[in-house]
């Protein structure tokens, strides 16, 4: 493996990078690359992947000189960082701490104290830094030290709220849930009730959390108790069409509609879609058919998929991907030939795949040096619904070049479904950056060894 190949594999979180470090004698030649990625956020989508902190620490440990990394990681962690990088460094330092490095403990404690002192004084809370979320993570980490440490965190929160004069400086609800899971709901609730009697700040925080939870429940109950008519959808679609990202404005109404809509309601909505003249409004109405078959002839939807209006084209393809029809297969092949993977047409093959499509997909996939997340997802959907031994070159390329480690886990499952998951790939997956993939690989290896 060249340094460039190692760098690409490490950035993507592939187990092959860890195996390479174990294999080569002069693995310190890779130390600059490992350090660079420790100090740089390399997560693609942390909401589904988490961070690659544990994975990077695995690489650091193999190099047999972790102290060389620890000081630089601590220096970086001590600065004011945006949330994603801070979480990655936090996860690495937690691994150091678990292995007994006191300097890592001190760095985590210092960050906790810095945020404890700074958060009450800020005029506003920048979403780039998400420092209240960072403080949450540090409080959750401290739970491992025992109930007395949790109690101290509650005292600290009381002081922060008193200093600021309101509860804006902390979140705490997730920390409270974690504490209940660890120490028991009865014990935690008893202590919080006791603190509410002693501290007006803590009582104010608890009351605020309870009011927020009550408001959330009332909102959900009200949202799903309302019956949304087609006329109401049309009215809101026209209002949403003027926004920069209009489809997000319709998500709530889609949930409300599908909860109670009858077949007659869907039929009425379908005719409304066909009659609508404005393409953006038409698209917003069409998106209500979320995993629900369009009840009329799909010929107009096929035409919409070729529209110059990007939103209408995109949503038409999303609706058509759940329909099995020869015309949709032909459309997918046509769009892939004309626009390639940028056409979002791969998803149409989930229900309309044919063996001959492997060659079409392979020729497009191997041209891409970096496979985008939506392509990874579509490939995984196709080959977990259909079995093809000739799909291995496609799946291998997407596995090695995909940008999302969560989607890579689904690619590995597709390999298994198609019976092309090799022992070499399975061994790599044991060291993958995504925890679910590591677990899946270990489970398969254990099953195969019986």
Task: For every predicted segment, state its role.
Residues 1, 227-237, 263-269, 325-328, ...:
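Repeat-mediated protein-protein interaction surfaces in helical alpha-solenoids
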Residues 17-29, 40, 44-65, 75, ...:
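Structural detector for internal amphipathic alpha-helices that build alpha-solenoid repeat scaffolds
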Residues 318, 397-398:
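Long C-terminal tail modules that include membrane-anchoring/sorting signals and adjacent low-complexity
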Residues 1-21:
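N-terminal "cap/leader" segments of large eukaryotic alpha-helical scaffolds
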Residues 2-3, 31, 135-136, 168, ...:
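Core helices of alpha-solenoid repeat scaffolds
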Residues 1-4, 424, 443-450:
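Terminal, non-catalytic domain-edge segments
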Residues 6, 34-39, 73-77, 104-111, ...:
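Buried hydrophobic core positions in alpha-solenoid tandem helical repeats
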């Amino acid at each position: 493996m060249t340094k460039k190949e190692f760098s690409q594999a490490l950035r993507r979180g592939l187990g092959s990078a860890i195996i390479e470090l174990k294999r080569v004698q002069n693995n310190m030649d890779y130390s600059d690359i490992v350090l660079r990625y420790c100090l740089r956020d390399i997560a693609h989508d942390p909401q589904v992947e988490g961070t690659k902190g544990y994975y990077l620490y695995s690489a650091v440990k193999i190099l047999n000189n972790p102290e060389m990394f620890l000081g630089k990681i601590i220096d970086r962690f001590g600065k004011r960082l945006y949330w994603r990088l801070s979480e990655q460094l936090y996860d690495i330092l937690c691994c150091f701490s678990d292995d007994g490095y006191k300097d890592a403990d001190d760095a985590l404690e210092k960050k906790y104290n810095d945020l404890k002192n700074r958060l009450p004084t800020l005029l506003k809370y920048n979403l780039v830094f998400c420092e209240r979320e960072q403080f949450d993570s540090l409080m959750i980490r401290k739970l491992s030290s025992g109930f007395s440490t949790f109690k101290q965190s509650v005292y600290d929160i009381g002081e922060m709220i008193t200093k600021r004069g309101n509860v804006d400086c902390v979140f705490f609800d997730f920390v409270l849930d974690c504490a209940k899971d660890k120490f028991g709901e009865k014990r935690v609730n008893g202590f919080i009730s006791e603190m509410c009697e002693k501290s007006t700040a803590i009582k104010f925080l608890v009351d605020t959390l309870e009011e927020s939870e009550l408001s959330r429940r009332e909102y959900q109950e009200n949202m799903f108790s309302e019956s949304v008519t087609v006329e109401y959808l049309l009215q809101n679609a026209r209002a949403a069409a003027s926004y920069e990202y209009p489809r997000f404005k319709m998500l709530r109404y889609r949930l409300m509609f599908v909860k109670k809509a009858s077949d007659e309601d869907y039929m009425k909505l379908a005719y409304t879609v066909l009659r609508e003249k404005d393409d953006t409004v038409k698209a917003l109405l069409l998106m209500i058919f979320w995993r629900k078959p369009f009840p009329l002839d799909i010929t107009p939807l096929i035409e919409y998929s070729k529209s110059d209006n990007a939103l209408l084209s995109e949503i038409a393809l999303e609706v058509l991907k759940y329909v099995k029809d020869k015309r949709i297969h032909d459309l997918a092949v046509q769009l892939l030939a004309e626009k390639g993977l940028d056409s979002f047409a791969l998803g149409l093959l989930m229900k309309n795949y044919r063996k001959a499509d492997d060659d079409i997909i392979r020729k497009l996939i191997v041209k891409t040096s970096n496979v985008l997340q939506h392509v990874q997802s579509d490939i995984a959907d196709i080959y977990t619904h259909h079995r093809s031994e000739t799909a291995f070159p496609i799946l291998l390329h997407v596995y090695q070049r995909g940008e999302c480690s969560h989607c890579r886990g689904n690619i590995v499952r597709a390999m298994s479904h198609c019976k092309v998951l090799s022992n070499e790939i399975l061994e790599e997956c044991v060291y993958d950056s995504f925890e679910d993939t590591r677990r899946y690989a270990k489970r398969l290896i254990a099953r195969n060894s019986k």
